Amino acid sequence: MGRSLKKGPFVADHLLRKIEALNERNAKEVIKTWSRASTIVPEMIGHTIAVHNGKQHVPVYITEQMVGHKLGEFAPTRNFRSHVKGDKKARH
C-alpha cells in the first residue's frame, strides 16, 4: 500500500534543507545521508547523494528516472560473493 497523496512523499527535513541550499547557490557537493527511506524528489536531480549502506556511504547520482523511488534502493546493503566453483565438500 502506498502513501496517501494528501501527505506527500517522505523526505527527511535535514536532507531537503541541504538540497534547497545547494540549489539556491547553484553548487554541486556530495551530501552524506543516513536517510535511506527518503523519497527522491525533482529538486534532487543532478545532485550526488552519498547514501549509507550500513558500512559506508555509496555515492548516488540522481537522474530524472529515479524520481519517486527511495534513496535506499540505490545503495545495496548485501554483497553476494559467488559460490566457490570447485567445492566438492558440499556434495557427498
Swiss-Prot record:
GO cellular component: cytoplasm; small ribosomal subunit
Species this protein is from: Thermosynechococcus vestitus (strain NIES-2133 / IAM M-273 / BP-1)
Family: Belongs to the universal ribosomal protein uS19 family.
InterPro entries, alphabetized: Ribosomal_uS19, Ribosomal_uS19_bac-type, Ribosomal_uS19_CS, Ribosomal_uS19_SF
Classification via Gene3D superfamilies: 30s Ribosomal Protein S19, Chain A (3.30.860.10)
Source species taxonomy: Bacteria, Bacillati, Cyanobacteriota, Cyanophyceae, Acaryochloridales
UniProt keyword terms in alphabetical order: Ribonucleoprotein, Ribosomal protein, RNA-binding, rRNA-binding
Name of the featured protein: Small ribosomal subunit protein uS19
GO molecular function annotations of the record: rRNA binding; structural constituent of ribosome
Superkingdom of this protein's organism: Bacteria
Function summary: Protein S19 forms a complex with S13 that binds strongly to the 16S ribosomal RNA.
UniProt cross-references to HAMAP family, sorted A to Z: Ribosomal_uS19
One Gene Ontology term from the biological process aspect of the record: ribosomal small subunit assembly
